[in-house]
Every structure is written in C-alpha cells, then in structure tokens.
Amino acid sequence: MDINPKFVYQSPVHFDELDPMQMLHNSRFPAHVERAISAFYTSSGRKWEPRVDDNPDQFHVVRDLHIEYLNPLIGPGSMRVDVWVERIGTTSCVYGFLCSSADGNIPYARGERTIVKIDPASYRPSPWSDFFRARHADLLKDLPAYA
C-alpha cells in the first residue's frame, strides 16, 4: 500500500504524440511530467506570471532529468502522473515521478527531475521562497520509492 504523499494528475495523451508503432514516444514523457508539476503549482495557488517579481519561484531551470522506461503506453487516452518531492534544498528541488495507466495499475516510466531556482538578474542559484518550501513539504517523501 502506498502511503507517501503525492500529487496525482491525469494527463491526456494525443495521437500526434505516438510513434509509428502507436506507442507514446519516449520524448513525450517529460512533457507530461512538466504538465503534472505545472498543475501542482496551480493547485498550490500559484500561477505562471508575466512578471517574475510576481512569482519569483517560477524562475528556475531543469538541472537533471532521469527516466527509466518500464512498459509501452499504446494508443491515445489518459496517463496518470504521480509527482512527489524526493528532496528539497536551499536552491534545488528533486521531484520523483511515476507515469502509469489511468488506473495506476501499469507503470510506464519513472524517474526524477531536478530544478534549481535562479536569480533573474545574476542567473545564479537563489533560495526558494517560504511559500514554495512549505507547499513542497506537503509532498516530501519519507518512505521508500513507489515503484
């Protein structure tokens, strides 16, 4: 039984994301993970702002992305994306994720995505806001990985 905190997002898979074998192309999984993390931000009361000053935590870069492909996703439909926080540092945040069938029974891919908040003036690492840290603490994993 999975009792770790996580954010669950149902991500639509469209026919134009499929390869010639009707499988979700490997390059599309990161986009679905990004959509899930964006939905988590929105559910937290934050949104992407035209002015960085209105939401400084949105000014971050992806430092690392690791994906392990487990099973093919065949055809269009819905894919479940579970997102949790593996670690949060002063300037970095490591998300864990699991992409699976809509019912969560078939795992397709799992991995980690690391982001680093940067200062918009210097492009150097910059600390997360208290709001970001508090909201992400809700998803902090404290037990072994899901899959």
Regions found by a protein language model. Name each.
Residues Q22, V83, Y123:
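Hydrophobic pocket/interface hotspot
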